[in-house]
């Protein structure tokens, strides 16, 4: 499995634990919803700055995003 897909799956797993939809979460962290959806689907290479926004929005560390990959 490609790393983008693994990271996207991990982000989706953590986001669903928050109870927020993609749309509400993307709005919370200031990222376009369609971009965020493509990240979760593993279709986008994501910039580190956006990984930081996602981690902050999930209240996890960057290393937590990569746990189990």
Please place each PLM-identified region on the residue numbering.
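Alpha-helical residues within the helix-turn-helix
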Residues: 16, 27, 56
């Amino acid at each position: 499995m490609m790393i983008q897909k693994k990271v996207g799956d991990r982000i989706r797993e953590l986001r669903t634990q928050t109870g927020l939809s993609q749309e509400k979460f993307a709005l919370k962290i200031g990222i376009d919803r369609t971009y965020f959806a493509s990240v979760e689907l593993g279709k986008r290479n994501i910039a580190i700055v956006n990984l930081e926004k996602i981690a902050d929005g999930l209240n996890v560390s960057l290393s937590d995003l990569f746990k189990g990959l």
